[in-house]
Amino acid sequence: MFSRRNLVALGLAATVSAGPCDIYEAGDTPCVAAHSTTRALYSSFSGALYQLQRGSDDTTTTISPLTAGGVADASAQDTFCANTTCLITIIYDQSGNGNHLTQAPPGGFDGPDVDGYDNLASAIGAPVTLNGQKAYGVFMSPGTGYRNNEATGTATGDEPEGMYAVLDGTHYNDACCFDYGNAETSSTDTGAGHMEAIYLGNSTTWGYGAGDGPWIMVDMENNLFSGADEGYNSGDPSISYSFVTAAVKGGADKWAIRGGNAASGSLSTYYSGARPDYSGYNPMSKEGAIILGIGGDNSNGAQGTFYEGVMTSGYPSDDVENSVQENIVAAKYVSGSLVSGPSFTSGEVVSLRVTTPGYTTRYIAHTDTTVNTQVVDDDSSTTLKEEASWTVVTGLANSQCFSFESVDTPGSYIRHYNFELLLNANDGTKQFHEDATFCPQAPLNGEGTSLRSWSYPTRYFRHYENVLYAASNGGVQTFDSKTSFNNDVSFEIETAFAS
């Protein structure tokens, strides 16, 4: 029970001027870690929210709120990253404990980057507005992860804690594991009960809930729990809002899952009760590391989008969490534009010309399933003209973006697979739709457009040795070379050779 003093303090903290961590503080469950790329989570916070590194010269900068307690300065990011690419290298802890999140190291599983590290997220994959002010979330493709194995003040053993995260309920998969929360300090699986983290996705390998997902569950290691029992729990609903509030808390022989729409309404309780009655989960053996986008052993096949989240000391009351939800709703999250450059019109037929000096007579075409560049002109054969012409359709995975259907092979689209661009028939799956959706960006060399992958926003259409890839600006693949990257990912949009 709250004292009258705490209830009054909580009421004051729930005003729009307060941040989520002010509310937790008023409820005697202070934040020990607070992460967001979109806004300050304390009313007085004016420090760095996150660090960027740009691809043109590897220079870094930090992005802070426009005002204390306010929204991130997206214009500073846009200026810093103009005509190049940017990665989010650090997500700073606002709590003062120094629990910053950086590129996750290898563990039980290696990541795809150099030396087994996970990938870093693109800085532009999740644009939003908060009360009309532009900001960017953290769009995390499979293989992307952040971690802190030396966190301070987080719960260990069976100590009580709470956490929440604002996530995208439309961006998920069934792989392990899109988590935010408490994990092992070794980046390896050290046994049941060694984690307590929010999970969002539609995995059914361990626990699952009602409907087809995604579900908010709790990753306690060696199991995702949707309720008291292993496997199915009907009380855990599918939750697919564009902005989801996921709240989890755990203490001695008790834990809870709560959730709701981060843009409106209140939180619902999906489970609140005793710990799972299976070996290792009562008491818990939490280790206190912090993860984002991955499992405790660096399982990194999941995808999702993170906007903000905190971890607390102590078991927050429902009243505190309800007030935090009111604060989140008052922030007025709205999805932003994924398109920044010359766009397309659904239904038009186009040809896309290379702008790299010395290659400007070449167009994106295909030979069977291989997407490549070929020299095409008015005297070319009808067959080649058709192979170099593309029907633009509304993005199969996201209606803001576009997909490109072959004129000579109707029903087949450009998609990435192992980061090669291929022409494949649409099989109707979620995976294909995501692989075949691309978002026009301002051209990196100033000519035409640059087309980035919706599902891997660090990767763009790139011609390399006359073959098309989904390439990043630097990376482990030969086609990720930084040499001539801006030219190689910029294409002029021209009238199609065939329709």
Curated annotation (Swiss-Prot):
- What does this gene product do? Able to hydrolyze 1,5-, 1,3- and 1,2-alpha-linkages not only in L-arabinofuranosyl oligosaccharides, but also in polysac-charides containing terminal non-reducing L-arabinofuranoses in side chains, like L-arabinan, arabinogalactan and arabinoxylan.
One GO biological-process annotation of the entry reads:
pectin catabolic process
Q: Which domain of life is it from?
A: Eukaryota
Glycosylation site list: 83, 202
Q: Which SUPFAM superfamilies match?
A: AbfB domain, Concanavalin A-like lectins/glucanases
GO molecular function annotation: alpha-L-arabinofuranosidase activity
By sequence similarity, the record places it as follows: Belongs to the glycosyl hydrolase 54 family.
Q: In its UniProt entry, what is this protein called?
A: Alpha-L-arabinofuranosidase B
Identify the EC number(s): 3.2.1.55
Q: Which Pfam families match?
A: AbfB, ArabFuran-catal
Under what conditions is it induced?
Answer: By growth on polymeric substrates and L-arabitol.
Write down the PANTHER family for this protein, in alphabetical order: ALPHA-L-ARABINOFURANOSIDASE B
Q: Which organism is it from?
A: Aspergillus niger
Q: Which reaction does it catalyse?
A: Hydrolysis of terminal non-reducing alpha-L-arabinofuranoside residues in alpha-L-arabinosides
Keywords carried by this UniProt record: Glycoprotein, Glycosidase, Hydrolase, Signal
Pathway the protein contributes to: Glycan metabolism; L-arabinan degradation
- Supply the InterPro entries for this chain: A-L-arabinofuranosidase_B_cat, ABFB, AbfB_ABD, AbfB_ABD_sf, ConA-like_dom_sf
User: Which residue positions does the secretion signal occupy?
Assistant: 1-18
